[in-house]
Amino acid sequence: MQVFDSWAGELSPSTFKQFSEPFLAHISKHLPIRLKELGLDQVPMIVFPKGANQVLDSVCNLGYHVVGLDWLIEPSEAVKIRGDRPVVFQGNADPGVLYGTEKSISETVEQMVSGFGGGKKGWIANLGHGRSNIMLLNPPSV
């Protein structure tokens, strides 16, 4: 289950703490309880507060299994902020790279892999956001 806060990056840290964080925390705390009450299996929970890199430390404490990252934070910086908390990152290739050459896409992926530590644990390769509407009108050729 993925929770998007597409405007999180437009909020100051204090405004995020007041108007977004409580609701994101409520979902991560109460959804597993409700699923259990309904006799349903637990599901992995992902939060994607787009652009809220200034509050990544707080987001890593919200109780989600996975935190989605946009392309505006370096993976290595996100890893430093996360520390040893058991949070997996998802992202964070710039969607615009899809307009590039095969070589530029490969270079972007290699940088992302390296930034997340080069291993196979603790992150999920993905774009740092969905495709733009422009891509629907002018799809990438690679």
Where are these regions (language model features)?
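Active-site loop segments of alpha/beta catalytic cores
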Residues: 1-142
